[in-house]
Design a protein with these regions (language model features):
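A short glycine-rich beta-strand->turn/loop micro-motif centered on a GG-aromatic cluster
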Residues: 87-104, 144-149
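Phosphate-binding P-loop
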Residues: 61-64, 109-116
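Conserved NTP phosphate-binding and transfer environment spanning the P-loop NTPase/kinase superfamily
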Residues: 208-214, 218-315
Length: 315
């Protein structure tokens, strides 16, 4: 679960021992053995918990009332025993009934709810991510799928990003953000393929994206080149060249050679031009069959508050 702290009660060997005792000698003896292991770790566990509590207490954004939310796999003895222990220390534990299993059901169910999704689409370099950030800044409901996936979606998408979350974590993060929204209001997302790097967009959510209203951002080639240069010229040459080589079969030998040499010589406009045609063709292919598209020309426009009125006019 997002922002949770993992405090294992048992390691793999201990779990195996407890499981074996449970099968051969029954639940009672397995519980006793588990308590022996737990007793040896109680001090360390409490230290970790109190460190987290101290960190929260010094947070200026804290709520007045403090509860410790505890969960385990199915809401059984592990979470219940920790809750009992915390009660002895006059703390306020809350256990998640049904545990993480129930939480995951809630996560997956949340993607099936009917949502008013608005997809921001456009060719590479039209500033879709910056536009989404602008909408977020002005309190529009937005889901930053690339931000949550720690990947921009292209062969260059992992540059400068943190390690990608697991697909399960990715789904949990999206669901937690959706929980804050009114589904009857517009929810803005950037157009994506089904996979963002190694993260897969939840199937039900992606289906809603495919059938949603779309705003296609139009910008001049000059604007798009500037956008790409500002985004990618800051990275190491070796990283950029590795990214180009991953799509060399699609670029072809001539464009691959131009891109690699241009990176080496820091001719960023040539680098971007050499890959732009490839990504434009990919975009046109993905656009086939899409309907309900409104065009929004932002050529030479500053991405500031003045754009919001233009967006509202095309909705």
């Amino acid at each position: 679960m997002p922002n949770s702290i993992n405090i294992p009660l048992f390691d793999n060997d201990e779990r195996s021992i407890i499981g074996t005792i449970y099968k051969k000698e029954g639940r009672k003896k397995a519980v006793i053995e588990g308590l022996k292991f737990f007793e040896n770790k109680m001090e360390l566990l409490l230290d970790n918990l109190f460190m987290s509590i101290d960190s929260y207490e010094t947070n200026p954004k804290k709520n007045n009332e403090f509860f410790i939310k505890i969960y385990c796999s199915r809401g059984g003895m592990r979470s219940q025993s920790i809750a009992w222990l915390l009660e002895k220390y006059k703390l306020n534990p809350i256990t998640l009934k049904g545990g993480y299993k129930i939480y995951r059901k809630w996560v997956l169910d949340s993607f099936s709810k009917k949502m008013n999704i608005v997809v921001i689409s456009g060719k590479t370099g039209t500033g879709k991510t910056r536009l989404l950030s602008l909408l977020e800044k002005y309190k529009y409901q937005t889901i930053d799928l690339e931000g949550f996936a720690c990947h921009r979606g292209s062969t260059f998408g992992g540059l400068g990003m943190k390690k990608q979350p697991s697909n399960e974590q990715f789904e949990n993060i999206i669901a937690e953000k959706l929980k804050l929204f009114k589904c009857s209001n517009d929810i803005f997302v950037e157009a994506e393929s089904a996979n963002i790097g190694k993260c897969k967009i939840p199937h039900e959510f992606f289906n809603q994206m495919k059938n949603s209203r779309r705003i296609e951002i139009l910008r001049s080639e000059s604007n798009r080149l500037d956008e790409l240069i500002n985004t990618y010229s800051v990275f190491k040459k070796e990283e950029l060249q590795e990214s180009v080589l991953r799509i060399k079969k699609r670029l072809g030998p001539q464009r691959t050679k131009i891109a690699l040499e241009s990176i080496n010589n820091e001719k960023w406009d040539l680098v971007c031009r050499s890959v732009l045609d490839y990504y434009d063709k990919c975009y046109e292919f993905e656009k086939v069959g899409k309907t309900n598209i409104k065009l929004l020309d932002l050529t030479d426009k500053k991405y500031d508050e003045s754009i919001l009125e233009l967006i509202n006019n095309v909705l």
